[in-house]
Each structure stands twice: as structure tokens, then as C-alpha cells.
């Protein structure tokens, strides 16, 4: 077991890769009664086409990672959630576009819940009947999101941008993909993506790391696993063009909502991707928030409302720049976004405002070291992406005004989609 201490942030954690390949990270928080353990696989909603070392490809229906997450809690001989509750632990799980994670937290003994977490995640117990039953539950969940205007706006925006990329699908897939999913597909996907050599376990606790690690070793030694067959997401060949330059539809709302989104070039290097994201995000804040002297006028004139925001998402095979609001003045908002993008590319950075923003984000990152959930998911995401967790935090502090200008000037914003939700008449 290797001990690692980051002097700048005064944080200590221990790492070990077990014989079966499971990567274990124990973040030591002395003096805390609470413990949190998260077990994750880099199987997310974007993993619809995978490839092994021999070049064999495997395709899955959209939403299969989310479907598996639902089924993992189902065991024929026990109720996993009730078992965690009986031991005084809260258990949950989530699927994102890049990973699936299962976790519990407790202020009591961790021995029982930790063994249960390892055991239930490392065993899939499904039947044809249980899979068919789950389909109705998931479809109902997807239909619920379809009725939520905010979720629908984002989903329709991605569908307007992407021809082939899995971002055009909801994390849960769609009704057709869910209905077509079979038990055999779920089992094959599980076998390829839930091997210990693919997964990671992160624990954040004030309890003795050596005792915890020994329990994990003991649990894993008692199990047999097939040899690991490394698998990875197959790269997506996505056209630079968008699917729909304009798209409008109606929902049961009172004020129109719209999104203006640009399809950006991807960035393969993980740390460079993070740096570019932060540069763009800081530029968005400087130009499209209350830091801009014009912001109050936009509000007063009704061009934007309290429902307003901007975001950026860069991946190894995708990129999105997004602005959205709720307004009657949809044309004026489109023109405003054009102006903001021009400002970002010719930005004269106010150094005081930039330092204030950096301090806010960096302070938030440092405060997240007090959140067990943030530590676990942050470490897992950085590890799966291939960069050091603390290096990701250091990037914010290192960004300069010229970095922001250089990145924003390099953006190609010609591939754009506008999506509008209008009130039903």
C-alpha cells in the first residue's frame, strides 16, 4: 500500500492495485466519523461501441449502462437496499456519460456495508422476466424527463448538433433502445466492463486505512474472476457539421426557452482539454454574467431572465459551447450570443475580475476537499480520464489572461444550432 501526501492541499491517501487488478484508493480523513465508499466502472452512456485489443467490436443499445445500474441492485435472494439500511448505511448509484458508480455512506461500522458493496457490484443476477419488467420502469422515467422543459431543451440541442455521437441520446437511451435491450446484451456488457481490472474503489474515511485495505484484500481473495480482456470506447467519427441549424417545438410552458449551441473541435489530451475548458468557462463568466456591465440592461430589457446560463463541454471526441435562457425576445437573445462570442474572441481581460473569478473557483475546489462525495467522484473521474486529481485543481490557479484569449481566438464557432421551445397555443 502506497502512501501519498499532497503538501499544497495537506491531503493524504493510500493506493494499491490488488492481484485481480482492482485499483483501491483510501483517502484518510482523521477525526471524521462519516465514511463513504464508491465503486465505479468507466462504462457510461457514451460507450455504445467498444473495441478490444484484437480489434473486435461490440455494439450496445443506447442506455445500456443505465439499464445495468438499475439491475445491479436486484438479487434473487436479497434486497440490497434494505440490507444497507439494516446496517445503518445509505446506498445509491448513478450513471453519467462516462462512468457508472455505486456508493454508500455511513457514520457507523463500515465492515458489513463495504463487503456488501463489493459483493453486489461484482455479481449480476438477472432473468429474462426481470429485464422485461425493468423496461417499463425505465421508459416511464424517460417519459417523465421528456415532460420537463429544461431537460428536453438540452436533449433536443444535442440531437441538433450530433449525427453519430452518443451524446444525441439521453443517458437512459430512448424507448426503442430500452425496449430492444436483452438479458444477453446486459450480461455481455457486464462481463466486459465490470471486471476488477477495469474498476476502481475509492474510500473516504477517518478509520484506519490498513485495516480497511486488509478487509478489501480479504474480500477479493475469496472470489474468482476470468482473465481481463481490456476494452475501450471505439472512437467516434463525427462530422463537423450540425444536424439541424434551427429546430423549434412546443411544450406546455408560458415563456419560450431557447438554446444557442456551437459544435467545437474535440481535444484528445485530458489535461489540455481541462485547461481549455477552464479558459472558455472563465471567458463566459467575464462576458456573460453580472461581471459584464451590460448584464443588468439585458435583464431589464427582458433579453435574458433568471433562467439563464452558459456552459462548455470538451471531450476527446466532441465539443459543445452552450448559451440558454427563457425569454420572449428570442431573436434578441440570438444576437446577444453572437455579440458575446465576438467579445470572448477579442477579450480585454480585467485582471481584478479574472483574479476574483479564479479565487472563487479555486476556493470552491479546495472546499470540495471537505466533501466526501466530491473527493470520491472527482478522483475517479480524473483517474479514468488519465490525469492527476490535484493537477486538475492546479490548472485553475495557473490560467493567465493571455491563455483565455489564445483559447477563445482558436474556437471555430461556425457550426451552430438554435433550439427554441414555444408555448403551446
List each language-model region with its residue ranges:
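His/Glu-rich zincin catalytic helix
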Residues: 1-79, 187-297, 417-425
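Charge-rich, well-structured scaffold segments of protease-associated domains
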Residues: 79-231, 269, 275, 279, ...
Amino acid at each position: 500500500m502506497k502512501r501519498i501526501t499532497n503538501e499544497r492541499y495537506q491531503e493524504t491517501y493510500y493506493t494499491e492495485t490488488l492481484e485481480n487488478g482492482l485499483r483501491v484508493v483510501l483517502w484518510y480523513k482523521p477525526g471524521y466519523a462519516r465514511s463513504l465508499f464508491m465503486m465505479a466502472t468507466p462504462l457510461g452512456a457514451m460507450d455504445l461501441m467498444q473495441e478490444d485489443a484484437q480489434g473486435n467490436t461490440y455494439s450496445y443499445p443506447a442506455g445500456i449502462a443505465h439499464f445495468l445500474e438499475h439491475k445491479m441492485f436486484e438479487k434473487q435472494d436479497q434486497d440490497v437496499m434494505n440490507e444497507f439500511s439494516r446496517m445503518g448505511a445509505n446506498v445509491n448509484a448513478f450513471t453519467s456519460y462516462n462512468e457508472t458508480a455505486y456508493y454508500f455512506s455511513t457514520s457507523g461500522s463500515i465492515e458489513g456495508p463495504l463487503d456488501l458493496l463489493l459483493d453486489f457490484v461484482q455479481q449480476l443476477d438477472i432473468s429474462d422476466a426481470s429485464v422485461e419488467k425493468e423496461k417499463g420502469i425505465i421508459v416511464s422515467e424517460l417519459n417523465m424527463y421528456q415532460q420537463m422543459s429544461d431537460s428536453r431543451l438540452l436533449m433536443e440541442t444535442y440531437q441538433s448538433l450530433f449525427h453519430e455521437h452518443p451524446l444525441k441520446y439521453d443517458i437512459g437511451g430512448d424507448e426503442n433502445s430500452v425496449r430492444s435491450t436483452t438479458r444477453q446484451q446486459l450480461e455481455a456488457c457486464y462481463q466486459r466492463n465490470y471486471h476488477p481490472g477495469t474498476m476502481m474503489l475509492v474510500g473516504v474515511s477517518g478509520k484506519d486505512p490498513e485495516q480497511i485495505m486488509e478487509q478489501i484484500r480479504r474480500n477479493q481473495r475469496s472470489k474468482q474472476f476470468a482473465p481481463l480482456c481490456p476494452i475501450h470506447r471505439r472512437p467516434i467519427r463525427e462530422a463537423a457539421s450540425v444536424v439541424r441549424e434551427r429546430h423549434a417545438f412546443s411544450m406546455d410552458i408560458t415563456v419560450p426557452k431557447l438554446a444557442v449551441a456551437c459544435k467545437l473541435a474535440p481535444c484528445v489530451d485530458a489535461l489540455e482539454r481541462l485547461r481549455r475548458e477552464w479558459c472558455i468557462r472563465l471567458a463566459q463568466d467575464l462576458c456573460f454574467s453580472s461581471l459584464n456591465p451590460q448584464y443588468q440592461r439585458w435583464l431589464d430589457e427582458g433579453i435574458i431572465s433568471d433562467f439563464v446560463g452558459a456552459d462548455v463541454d470538451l471531450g476527446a471526441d466532441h465539443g459543445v459551447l452552450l448559451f440558454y435562457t427563457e425569454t420572449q425576445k428570442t431573436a434578441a437573445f440570438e444576437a446577444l450570443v453572437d455579440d458575446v462570442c465576438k467579445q470572448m474572441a477579442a477579450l480585454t481581460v480585467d485582471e481584478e475580475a479574472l483574479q476574483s473569478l479564479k479565487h472563487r473557483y479555486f476556493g470552491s475546489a479546495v472546499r470540495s476537499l471537505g466533501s466526501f462525495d466530491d473527493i470520491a467522484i472527482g478522483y475517479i473521474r480524473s483517474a479514468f480520464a488519465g490525469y492527476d486529481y490535484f493537477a486538475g485543481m492546479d490548472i485553475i490557479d495557473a490560467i493567465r489572461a493571455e491563455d483565455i484569449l489564445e483559447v477563445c481566438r482558436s474556437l471555430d464557432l461556425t457550426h451552430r444550432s438554435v433550439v427554441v421551445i414555444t408555448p403551446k397555443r
